[in-house]
């Protein structure tokens, strides 16, 4: 794909079938589980770059492992290789990945008995990991910065000789930890999650079984955004069902007041364009599903819908500073907003949104996909659209079928 994508003004009609990618969060958890526990197998790996890089990192005999731009990939691979005695690995990624925080996980693993050091800048990748036999079995945290750090520990917990016991005072994005625990329980692990603690019993061999994966609810958010901005929508998504391990399943509830209807069938989910139901100000807390923030807030911008959305404290630490990206987009559209460390609120909207100049994806897959539906309102151009390959490689192919 060319580095600059031109999106002409969209017709506003969406009708057809979209096969969403497999959820990379579940897939990456499943890869670690399959690597650590031989009776569990994973026969399907998504095409998402994050998942492919993790697969390579888990199977490679090379010392130096390149992990692309995936924060989850780095954190899970770090935990895995830390538990593999008599191995030496150096993990690194893109400049953006090497700038993302990792110290909380490294400190936790080292406290358990791992041997991890920094090759370059302190508290950042590249990481030098000398695989070790983990000897300790308990840790206490204050306020955790990322649920992914905790999830990485949960995945290796059953492989430790004494299991693992963790406590904490505060945990962001708890829904992702709940997803991990539910997945592990479903696969037969003995794990107990309470409000501020989790206990994992050492793994014992069980009946062989294959791990199955769900379609990605977070990817649906961008089609919900498109439906909300469309004049007519009838989209079918095979494989999405009303019961899911993913917290992002709540996307349907968040978009319903913005005119997005849905119906489940035995085969999947039907999205439709309904009358916009919202009145007054939309007030949401997205702490448990921050990956929905870009699509949801961009939709509010486009519809000039008043909103107050909190639970955004992790947005600055994603692939880009997503909170700042939203503030910048609002300014370009002529929208006045108020941002705090944890929230974004609309103050006033112009009578007509200002046209947008060339947009940068900022190396963020979700930012790129959240910008695409704005072409329902105006022509759009975007630099480096190929970044969507991180989680949804076929996004532009799917988008083009409705252009």
Where are these regions (language model features)?
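Short, structured segments at the rim of ligand-binding sites
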Residues: 1-403
């Amino acid at each position: 794909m060319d580095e600059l994508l031109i999106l002409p003004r969209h017709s506003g009609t969406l009708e057809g079938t979209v096969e969403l990618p497999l959820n990379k969060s579940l897939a990456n958890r499943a890869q670690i589980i399959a690597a650590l526990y031989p009776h569990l197998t994973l026969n399907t790996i998504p095409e998402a770059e994050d998942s492919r890089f993790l697969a390579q990192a888990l199977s490679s005999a090379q010392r130096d492992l390149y992990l692309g731009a995936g924060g989850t990939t780095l954190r899970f691979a770090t935990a895995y290789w830390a538990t593999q005695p008599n191995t030496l690995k150096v993990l690194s990624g893109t400049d953006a990945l090497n700038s993302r925080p990792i110290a909380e996980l490294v400190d936790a693993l080292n406290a358990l008995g791992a041997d991890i050091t920094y090759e370059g800048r302190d508290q950042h990748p590249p990481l030098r990991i000398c695989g070790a036999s983990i000897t300790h079995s308990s840790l206490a945290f204050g306020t955790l910065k990322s649920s992914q750090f905790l999830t990485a520990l949960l995945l290796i917990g059953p492989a430790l000789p004494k299991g693992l016991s963790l406590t904490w005072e505060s945990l962001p994005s708890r829904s992702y930890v709940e997803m991990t625990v539910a997945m592990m329980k479903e696969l037969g692990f003995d794990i107990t999650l309470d409000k501020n603690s989790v206990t994992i019993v050492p793994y014992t061999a069980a009946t062989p079984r294959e791990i199955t994966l769900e379609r990605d609810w977070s990817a649906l958010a961008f089609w919900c955004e498109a439906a909300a901005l469309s004049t007519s929508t009838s989209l079918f998504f095979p494989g999405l069902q009303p019961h899911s391990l993913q917290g992002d399943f709540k996307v349907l509830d968040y978009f319903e007041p913005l005119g997005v209807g849905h119906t489940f069938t035995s085969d999947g989910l039907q999205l439709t364009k309904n009358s916009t139901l919202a009145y007054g100000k939309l007030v949401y807390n997205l702490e448990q599903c921050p990956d929905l923030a870009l699509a949801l807030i961009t939709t509010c911008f486009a519809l000039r819908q008043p909103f107050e959305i909190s639970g955004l404290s992790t947005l600055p630490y994603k692939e880009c500073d997503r909170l700042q990206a939203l503030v910048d987009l609002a300014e370009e559209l002529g929208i006045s907003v108020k941002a705090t460390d944890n929230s974004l609120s609309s103050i006033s909207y112009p009578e007509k949104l200002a046209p947008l100049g060339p947009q940068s994806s900022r190396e963020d897959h979700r930012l790129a996909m959240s910008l695409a539906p704005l072409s329902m309102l105006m022509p759009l151009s975007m630099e480096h659209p190929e970044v969507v390959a991180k989680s949804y490689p076929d996004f532009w192919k799917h988008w083009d079928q409705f252009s």
